[in-house]
Amino acid sequence: MKIYLVGGAVRDSLLNLPIKDKDYLVVGATPEQMLQLGYRQVGKDFPVFLHPKNQQEYALARTERKIGLGYGGFSCHASPDVTLEQDLLRRDLTINAIAQDEKGNLYDPFNGIEDINARLLRHVSDAFVEDPLRVLRVARFAARFHALGFHIAAETLALMRQISASDELNALTAERVWQEVDKSLGGPHPEVFFEVLHQCGALEVLFPEIFALFGVPQPEKWHPEIDTGVHTLMVLAQAALLTEDKSVRFAALVHDLGKALSPKEHLPKHHGHGQKGLPLIKALCTRLRVPNETRDLALLVSDQHQNVHQAFELRAETIVKIFDKADFWRKPERLTQLILACIADMRGRTGFENNPYPQGEYLTQCFLAANNVDIAAIIAAGFQGAEIKQALNLRRIEAVSQFKQKMQTKLPTDEQ
């Protein structure tokens, strides 16, 4: 019985990155032996055990055989005669197929160390095509290690295209797809994840609403990058620079879905695209089972981002109506999220990357003015029932109007 450290821990150690989780591989043991040693079995489909003291995962060496569609369509064979190399052979990428024994010796039958040094994401074997989840995993690794200079091997990208052209991606569950998206949204370069999916053909299958944006033109005056799909990924990249909030990043990704529905005769203009995108966002979020809070922010950003961009031109009544509709009174953090997504939208354009966004501070101050209206004073003045809400609304509008008048000389555009 031999125990090896495998997978991400070995890879990240070689890259001098922090190690989050440690996974161990056990060669030459049976489930009965593991149980006798005090390990607790947790794997149903294949033998995975938790260490009796530190609760880390120890998996018995195994081989896999494809028997059906999807990432779950495998028959696993675990026995003491499965070798270290046989187990490593079933892994996705060479950089994840390196093992380290208890003395620190490295075992690298598929040249993963060489690929780490070459900054190359390369598949271990042609069995790569048997698991469609690997398309998303490789895209995520490309995004995660983008700053280190990693790129996908041409032959691996070809296999990813092969998977995308088959029916295999459709066999992935919504939960697994969203899990990979969620992990990528939390990384430093989520835009690379979607760039890779676009390159290999998976974006069209899994995210048709986003795929439809590529090739859709925008006015060159405001969008020197022209292509809406390119703009979308630039906005996502800017959102990642602005905040670690994954909901804001997702909202940035889907804020312009409605542009794909603009009539061809109206291009490159996109009137009402924010509202047109709402059903598309709802459909995407329902299909992928996106968390409700993330979905709701995405809908808010799509619906209101044009108003936020034009904040200086809005009447006080309109501003308060937006605050009401978004329920900022109870959820003031959503205003911050909305503004962050709008900053990303503004900066996600060629040549606009470092521009200021005074609309954000302006709307924040409008909200503070409106939110400072004293409800107790309204009640004390004798208002009752529905009158209270009406009086509150009027006083909030008046508060915003007074702030606007005070700011009149400082505004970049005329107030009409």
From Swiss-Prot:
Its EC number is 2.7.7.72, 3.1.3.-, 3.1.4.-. Mg(2+) binds at residues 21, 23. HAMAP family: CCA_bact_type1, CCA_bact_type2. A single active site specifically recognizes both ATP and CTP and is responsible for their addition. ATP binds at residues 8, 11, 91, 137, 140. It catalyses: a tRNA precursor + 2 CTP + ATP = a tRNA with a 3' CCA end + 3 diphosphate; a tRNA with a 3' CCA end + 2 CTP + ATP = a tRNA with a 3' CCACCA end + 3 diphosphate. Comprises two domains: an N-terminal domain containing the nucleotidyltransferase activity and a C-terminal HD domain associated with both phosphodiesterase and phosphatase activities. NCBIfam families: PRK10885.1 (NF008137). InterPro entries: CCA_bact (IPR012006), HD/PDEase_dom (IPR003607), HD_domain (IPR006674), NT_sf (IPR043519), PolA_pol_head_dom (IPR002646), PolyA_RNA-bd (IPR032828), tRNA_CCA-adding_enzyme (IPR050124). Belongs to the tRNA nucleotidyltransferase/poly(A) polymerase family. Bacterial CCA-adding enzyme type 1 subfamily. Residues 228-329 form the HD domain. This is Multifunctional CCA protein. The gene is cca. It holds the Pfam family HD. SUPFAM superfamilies: Nucleotidyltransferase, Poly A polymerase C-terminal region-like. Magnesium is required for nucleotidyltransferase activity. Nickel for phosphatase activity. Monomer. Can also form homodimers and oligomers. Gene3D superfamilies: Beta Polymerase, domain 2 (3.30.460.10), cca-adding enzyme, domain 2 (1.10.3090.10). Its cofactor is Mg(2+); Ni(2+). GO terms for biological process: RNA repair; tRNA 3'-terminal CCA addition. One of its GO terms (molecular function) is magnesium ion binding. Catalyzes the addition and repair of the essential 3'-terminal CCA sequence in tRNAs without using a nucleic acid template. Adds these three nucleotides in the order of C, C, and A to the tRNA nucleotide-73, using CTP and ATP as substrates and producing inorganic pyrophosphate. tRNA 3'-terminal CCA addition is required both for tRNA processing and repair. Also involved in tRNA surveillance by mediating tandem CCA addition to generate a CCACCA at the 3' terminus of unstable tRNAs. While stable tRNAs receive only 3'-terminal CCA, unstable tRNAs are marked with CCACCA and rapidly degraded. It comes from the Bacteria. CTP binds at residues 8, 11, 91, 137, 140. Keywords: ATP-binding, Hydrolase, Magnesium, Metal-binding, Multifunctional enzyme, Nickel, Nucleotide-binding, Nucleotidyltransferase, RNA repair, RNA-binding, Transferase, tRNA processing.
